Amino acid sequence: MKKRIALLPGDGIGPEVLDAAVDVLKSVAEHYQHEFEFEYGLIGGAAIDEAGAPLPEETVAACKAADAILLGAVGGPKWDQNPSELRPEKGLLAIRKQLDLFANLRPVKVFESLAGASPLKTEYIEGVDFVIVRELTGGLYFGKPSEQYVNQNGEEEAVDTLFYKKSEMERVIREAFQMAQSRKGKVTSVDKANVLESSKLWRKTAEEVAKEFPDVKLEHMLVDNAAMQLIYAPGQFDIIVTENMFGDILSDEASMLTGSLGMLPSASLSSSGLHLYEPVHGSAPDIAGQNIANPLAAILSAAMMLRTSFGLEAEAQAVEHAVDQVLRAGKRTKDLAKGSEHCTTQSITGEVKAALADDNAISNIMTAYV
């Protein structure tokens, strides 16, 4: 199989973890006889510094010419004082809008070998395996007006607008139900319908979509209760679907169930089939360039790409199994090591590649005896 992948390293540790993912993808290509072409593009602070904009047109063109997109991370204090249109995060928001990346999938799965790294007791997180489906292109982050100004009395004021079309709600909720059909068959729709008009429409829309999926159970949960339940009883969830800002907050909360943001991959899906994959963690500029960043979320994001965009289920499982084998062997990056000896970014990437090669060799031997 031949595929073109757009690579957007971004800022901070983004280039380091993306390099790790690319190294693993090259190993996959070698072991499974695929050909992956890589084209780099600028985004975020790096794009502001070099091209004067957080999302250059050349980057958008490179993405549209690709079969899938891998992103590192964007942002950092270096650009905090820039005007809003020259903030790194604007590049991420813009690419979501331009490519119509409407649904963000964030799997939350606790690796058995990492249960001790979670801040929660093992009995609370045992068997946790759910996905947060977050709407990406509407809501408070995109609604207009959104501005700061001085009123007639000389006092500073600010306004943001929470705006949604029903069609934007429908498509992401439908995506959640379709996913639930191949999992445990349960969707938890999270809103604030006791206060917000947009949430009342969200809840109504979820009820309507649910009628298309009689084999899937729908439950509604207010966002404040959902935040509590994620800590109190995370094992109850299968698919959580929610609007943009609620999903942004809840997914970061849920990420700590695994013990580190460095373990969580994500996918942003478009209606066109051109999807973007990225680790959940941020750019972590304080550790950039030190070879200590955890690349496993980026590597697992690449595995999601293999499965979702390319239909390469065996290859995706091989990467995930290699990561699991490395963790079971006790290999840890600094964020997971809790003061003990730890692996560097490059060394744990090498461990994953070695486990992938071993797994492939065993598969070849087994095939020879069939």
From Swiss-Prot:
Catalytic activity reads: (2R,3S)-3-isopropylmalate + NAD(+) = 4-methyl-2-oxopentanoate + CO2 + NADH
- One GO location term (cellular component): cytosol
Quote the record's binding site residues for substrate. Answer: 96, 106, 134, 224
Cofactor binding: number and manner = Binds 1 Mg(2+) or Mn(2+) ion per subunit.
Which UniProt keywords are present, listed alphabetically? Amino-acid biosynthesis, Branched-chain amino acid biosynthesis, Cytoplasm, Leucine biosynthesis, Magnesium, Manganese, Metal-binding, NAD, Oxidoreductase
GO MF term set: 3-isopropylmalate dehydrogenase activity; magnesium ion binding; NAD binding
- What InterPro entries does the record point to? IsoCit/isopropylmalate_DH_CS, IsoPropMal-DH-like_dom, Isopropylmalate_DH
**One Pfam match:** Iso_dh
Q: Which residues bind Mg(2+)?
A: 224, 248, 252
Which Gene3D superfamilies does this chain map to? Isopropylmalate Dehydrogenase
Record site feature (Important for catalysis), residues: 141, 192
Q: What SMART domains does the database record attribute to this sequence?
A: Iso_dh
Its annotated compartments are: Cytoplasm
Metabolic or biological pathway, per its Swiss-Prot or TrEMBL entry: Amino-acid biosynthesis; L-leucine biosynthesis; L-leucine from 3-methyl-2-oxobutanoate: step 3/4
Which residues make up the binding site for NAD(+)? 76-89, 282-294
Instruction: Write the Enzyme Commission number(s) for this entry.
Output: 1.1.1.85
Q: Which GO terms describe its biological process?
A: L-leucine biosynthetic process
Subunit organization = Homodimer.
User: What task does this protein carry out?
Assistant: Catalyzes the oxidation of 3-carboxy-2-hydroxy-4-methylpentanoate (3-isopropylmalate) to 3-carboxy-4-methyl-2-oxopentanoate. The product decarboxylates to 4-methyl-2 oxopentanoate.
According to its UniProt record, which protein family does this protein belong to?
A: Belongs to the isocitrate and isopropylmalate dehydrogenases family. LeuB type 1 subfamily.
Name of protein: 3-isopropylmalate dehydrogenase
Source organism (scientific name): Bacillus licheniformis (strain ATCC 14580 / DSM 13 / JCM 2505 / CCUG 7422 / NBRC 12200 / NCIMB 9375 / NCTC 10341 / NRRL NRS-1264 / Gibson 46)
